[in-house]
Amino acid sequence: MAKEEVLEFPGVVTELLPNAMFRVKLENEHEIIAHTAGRMRKNRIRVLAGDKVLVEMTPYDLTKGRITYRFK
């Protein structure tokens, strides 16, 4: 099964939410709810408020996303 077309946006984590969810403000000023990708959980990469991240979203639901990368 081919991977769906995904949209990637850089953003900043503004708030930590329960259940390993994060509120992320994207560069285009939209705010979304995102969770960490499985590889980030597996490698124990911590995400804190104020971190710059790369968020992956589907074109079907633009209010939720997945954090795939934390910039240094």
Curated annotation (Swiss-Prot):
Transmembrane segment boundaries: none
Domain S1-like per the UniProt entry, residue ranges: 1-72
InterPro entries per record: NA-bd_OB-fold, RNA-binding_domain_S1_IF1, S1_domain, TIF_IF1
Any single GO CC term annotated in Swiss-Prot or TrEMBL for this entry: cytosol
UniProt keywords, alphabetically: Cytoplasm, Initiation factor, Protein biosynthesis, RNA-binding, rRNA-binding
Pfam family, one: eIF-1a
Record CDD domains: S1_IF1 (cd04451)
Gene Ontology MF annotations: ribosome binding; rRNA binding; translation initiation factor activity
Listed SUPFAM superfamilies: Nucleic acid-binding proteins (SSF50249)
Localization in the cell: Cytoplasm
PROSITE patterns in UniProt: S1_IF1_TYPE (PS50832)
Family: Belongs to the IF-1 family.
Subunit record text: Component of the 30S ribosomal translation pre-initiation complex which assembles on the 30S ribosome in the order IF-2 and IF-3, IF-1 and N-formylmethionyl-tRNA(fMet); mRNA recruitment can occur at any time during PIC assembly.
Function per UniProt: One of the essential components for the initiation of protein synthesis. Stabilizes the binding of IF-2 and IF-3 on the 30S subunit to which N-formylmethionyl-tRNA(fMet) subsequently binds. Helps modulate mRNA selection, yielding the 30S pre-initiation complex (PIC). Upon addition of the 50S ribosomal subunit IF-1, IF-2 and IF-3 are released leaving the mature 70S translation initiation complex.
Protein name in UniProt: Translation initiation factor IF-1
